[in-house]
Curated annotation (Swiss-Prot):
Biological processes annotated in GO: mitochondrial electron transport, ubiquinol to cytochrome c
Organism: Geothlypis trichas
Binding site for a ubiquinone: H202
Family: Belongs to the cytochrome b family.
The name this protein goes by in its record: Cytochrome b
């Protein structure tokens, strides 16, 4: 019998078991495509980021000019930069949809996979934040100043911690240098965590839209889901390229076309769109430490979802009350995103506070209550 290299070679065997002969549920929908799309986003970001890093200079006097030089003088530098900047937006679109899928279908009951996923989200947010500082425009500088300053709310050690992170008494050259180092390093940490995430996932196998065990009805990953993933790649990459070519600055802030100036504060300091929901929660509490705790809680609350699952059914497919709550939560996050982009004025303050309260109420109180009620109604 001829030796099958794919199944016997030490390294190829790992790839084979993860991408070719992997038993997958026969009924997973397009919502299960976002994991592989996140993988493509990560590869795209690392490749474009590496090419950008070859031309970038991490110095306060040269950073802004080096980015301008890239866009003007480097072959296709403008395209590489636009793909990288907008690739970050697609990364977050995919991860938010991926998390939404996990919440809806009860995928969080694979606890290890879910917890590693939340750590991945936090790492991605850190990577995007330090990356946004690198072009050294006005919003880069002031965003870095405002967000790093939040750590000063930590009692007793806060101020020391902030000055240690800054490498001085304000955001300056040492800050930019270390942020570049971190922005280069963290994507590789994300790659490592992704492998851990996949390892845990392949221990249990994928969940499916019905939320029931699918061991009795599995199909090989290749060719069925490889072709399905390739369709997803084609759709997402065509959208990314369209955005990068037709409207590259649509999601950016015009303030970042002005070089960083510590003496001039922009009228509205706000992060990129993908952080606005958390920023709105931060702003809705009129106390620095309280705001920081709420900001942290807005993401860390995801760690609690497996513990708050009271339903006898895994998925929300057959749970209409939970479905209504879920879509209310989605609408609520969109409202928070919109409020975060608005100035701190009368209607927006109260809307932000109500939306922040609703966000935590739905996740921590209403989801478990609705699930318990549904158990009763369905006589489970």
């Amino acid at each position: 019998m001829a030796l099958n290299l794919r199944k016997n070679h030490q390294i190829l065997k790992i790839i084979n078991d993860a991408l070719i002969d992997l038993p997958a549920p026969s009924n997973i929908s397009t919502w299960w495509n976002f994991g592989s799309l996140l993988g493509i986003c990560l590869i795209t970001q690392i490749v474009t980021g590496l090419l950008l890093a070859m031309h970038y200079t991490a110095d306060t006097n040269l950073a802004f000019s080096s980015v301008a030089h890239m866009c003007r003088d480097v072959q296709f530098g403008w395209l590489i930069r636009n793909l990288h900047a907008n690739g970050a937006s697609f990364f977050f679109i995919c991860i938010y949809l991926h998390i939404g899928r996990g919440l809806y279908y009860g995928s969080y009951l694979n606890k290890e996979t879910w917890n590693v996923g939340v750590i991945l989200l936090l790492t991605l947010m850190a990577t995007a934040f330090v990356g946004y500082v690198l072009p050294w425009g006005q919003m880069s500088f002031w965003g870095a100043t405002v967000i790093t300053n939040l750590f000063s709310a930590i009692p007793y050690i806060g101020q020391t911690l902030v000055e240690w992170a800054w490498g001085g008494f304000s955001v300056d050259n040492p800050t930019l240098t270390r942020f570049f180092a971190l922005h280069f390093l963290l994507p590789f940490v994300i790659v490592g965590l992704t492998l851990v995430h996949l390892t845990f996932l392949h221990e249990t196998g994928s969940n499916n839209p019905l939320g029931i065990p699918s061991d009795c009805d599995k199909i090989p990953f290749h060719p069925y889901y490889t072709i399905k993933d390739i369709l997803g790649f084609a759709l997402m990459l065509s959208l990314l390229v369209s955005l990068a070519l037709f409207a590259p600055n649509l999601l950016g802030d015009p303030e970042n076309f002005t070089p960083a100036n510590p003496l001039v504060t922009p009228p509205h300091i706000k992060p990129e769109w993908y952080f606005l929901f958390a920023y709105a929660i931060l702003r809705s509490i009129p106390n620095k430490l309280g705001g920081v705790l709420a900001l942290a809680a807005s993401i860390l609350v995801l760690f609690l979802t497996p513990l708050l699952h009271t339903s006898k059914l895994r998925s929300m497919t057959f749970r209409p009350l939970s479905q209504i709550l879920f879509w209310t939560l989605v609408a609520n996050v969109l409202i928070l995103t919109w409020v975060g982009s608005q100035p701190v004025e009368h209607p927006f303050i109260i809307i932000g506070q109500l939306a922040s309260l609703t966000y935590f109420t739905i996740i921590l109180i209403l989801f478990p209550l609705a699930a318990a009620l549904e158990n009763k109604l369905l006589k489970l």
